[in-house]
């Protein structure tokens, strides 16, 4: 038992997929961003920029530990990379991610043009194609590095 981690850049469709999959499988679904936002008393999705990623990762680890007490297995959607100011990809610490009880990793991908449309529709924000392409590349690279380092299967 453990966490089935579904990764991918912003707007790729992680939450949309997992809402449906959770309903079908009866396996609960949580969003890393939502767990952090609830703890920080922020409105989820309001701000994509992270000021203190190390603190947020510590919060996420704590929230995951709490969830595992009630749910021995669940889906978690999240990221290996986030944007910092200026829409520059920022890699999350792999040592923190290694503490999150992942049993499997699924990396979702979509065409950058589709991701741009999804983000415009969902968040009302315009990102440059170059920034989304850079985020996708960083996310994919980190997913593979993490999987190799931890021997957690990546699909």
Language model regions located:
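ATP-dependent NMP and nucleoside kinases share a basic, alpha-helical "lid"
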Residues: 79-122
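Walker A (P-loop) phosphate-binding loop of P-loop NTPases
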Residues: 11
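Hydrophobic anchor at the beta1->P-loop junction of P-loop NTPases
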Residues: 6
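Conserved lysine of the Walker
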Residues: 14
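Conserved substrate/cofactor phosphate-moiety recognition/catalytic segment
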Residues: 19-60
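Small-molecule kinase domains that catalyze NTP-dependent phosphoryl transfer to phosphate-bearing small molecules
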Residues: 121, 125-155
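Walker A (P-loop) ATP-phosphate-binding motif of ABC ATPase nucleotide-binding domains
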Residues: 3
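Conserved nucleotide-sensing/catalytic segment adjacent to the nucleotide-binding pocket
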Residues: 44-84
